[in-house]
Amino acid sequence: LVLNRARLVGGAEAVPHWADRLAWPSKLHEGGPVSTDSIIGLGLGPDMPVEGISPLLGRLGVVDLHRDPLGLPDVEEVRLFAGYAGWTAGQLETEVAAGGWIVVDASEEDARTADPDGLWRIVLARQGGMVALLADYPDEPDLN
């Protein structure tokens, strides 16, 4: 999923029955260009596995948005994404091997940041070394 592109549409409009469980800012985010008519929810679940949330990292997991949220009382801070990013078989591995991506450890905080627009810089800055320098790279280097 692309984590840092909020849309103008409110998350409560997209999935009203989950409105009181949405993380702030409660916007529908662009998860990527594939299946943009589907909505994926990432949220925090309990420390132990429960039906209705597929664990990803720590307490972070994919939430079954078709379920009644009252049946998942321990699920909170849900962030909504329309669509997802996808690659053909072997494409991503080839791009990573060619140096086209910076691969870093994930943090459950990334998916629920209150500053999705600044997430790219936040993640790069915490890496340290040469990668951290990219966090301060200007959006338009030609204007620097």
Which role does the model predict for each range below?
Residues 1-81, 85-144:
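A short aromatic-anchored loop/beta-hairpin motif
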